């Protein structure tokens, strides 16, 4: 399935729709495994800019130097967000994804210090509460992807840390977007988060018609929640990441 150039725009759009439309989780992850070798080329065909916009948002909001911040990239896929994070100087990067094939692609450039196999919404994130200075979910908050009820799992963010989320506002995702906004509102009303700003952007796919807003959220004070087993602290920069199950 690998190819040197991405598919045509109609082919790539069809592939994205197919991925979102698979209801069975195992089949969906298998689809992503098979798609992984071509994924970067395909989203380049769509002129996909969500990773860059999310990192721009994070860079402007995060206090302190980027190189000292420990970042978690949830649903990291092939590592498009990591590539954008390295440009402004973020070096301590962890990633999780449910697709082994995607993680294999993400591991190859050596940008992540740790990669873990984890499907958010099906299992806890593999880090203890209050670990990360910032957590991002880019491109996975839509119908058929990460469920809204998984958002409280982001308590792996440190109190005072940042969470940066992107979603879409096209007609096929409006129901999910409304549910996501309701979830974020409930968390804010419960005192778990403080909303900083929502960035409406023209398009995340400049070759398509998906019109998402970008979100930033600030965990003000987090109540105790059931934490997943702790992993060891991050490895030294430049070491090969370890893929964990």
Swiss-Prot record:
Domain of life: Eukaryota
One of the Pfam families matching this protein, by short name: Methyltransf_25
Membrane spanning stretches: none
Entry keyword set: Williams-Beuren syndrome
Keyword Transmembrane helix among record annotations: no
Disease: METTL27 is located in the Williams-Beuren syndrome (WBS) critical region. WBS results from a hemizygous deletion of several genes on chromosome 7q11.23, thought to arise as a consequence of unequal crossing over between highly homologous low-copy repeat sequences flanking the deleted region. Haploinsufficiency of METTL27 may be the cause of certain cardiovascular and musculo-skeletal abnormalities observed in the disease.
Name of protein: Methyltransferase-like protein 27
Species annotation: Homo sapiens (Human)
